[in-house]
Amino acid sequence: MLKYLGTEDSSPQLKVTKAIQSFLFSLGDELLYIGYYDTLQSGVLNTPETSETYTFQFTTNIPCPGTPTVEYEGQVYNTIQIFSQCWLKENLNVGMMIPGSEWPTDNDTIEKNCYDNEPDSCTKYGGLYQWDEMMQYTTQQGTQGICPPGWHLPSDEEWKVLEGAVDSQYRIGDPEWDISLNYRGFDAATNLKTTSGWYQNGNGTNLYGFSGLPGGSRDLSGYFGYVGYYGYWWAATEYDSDDAWRRHRYGALSLIRNQ
């Protein structure tokens, strides 16, 4: 069954294995399609320019079809299929390490921080990246940024699809995911976190294989903190001219969306 979230009149005959649905949209509109199979839910987020055919994936916690691994800058990353989205299981660890006291610059070299200025921290948790550096100094959503060729940084809306796909109570398209500056959802965070490595009983179930780690952060003053307690993930979407959306997890079941 397909769930239509638009404002145009929609045909009721959508509870079929294949369906053709016509409605008006403007070029540049981002459309969210939600598919259901038994108790499973899957979503596709796209900005179509012509008629499109969408295939919903209901398998999860398996390597992405045809791309089980990605080799990039001397490292091998594993992929994970979570319904209709394909993610890297490991945090990116690419670029040249700079001290926490320094800021990256737009110099055609990817620069990262490693927690406590220890290279082993980047090996374990991935690099810590300032937003502009991660985006490679563009604000365009869907950009490759520091990702491998053919991959892109997830937008705020793509994060919402992931959150709804893995939460047991608030599903894709629920207004719950538009809430900011507070805990959201029911158990999305625990389902995305690793089963070990989090302090204060913060370990997750890793139910979908996302393998979120508590890599900590580097703040504006260059101070490192919260490794083992917090995990932070950027979205490639600006909140305003000074901030961007991000997700972070602590020892709770739900996720915080803030900037």
Model-derived segments and their meaning:
Residues 35-45:
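Short acidic/polar inter-strand loop motif in beta-rich domains
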Residues 45-65:
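Extracellular beta-sheet/turn segments enriched in Thr/Pro/Gly and aliphatic residues
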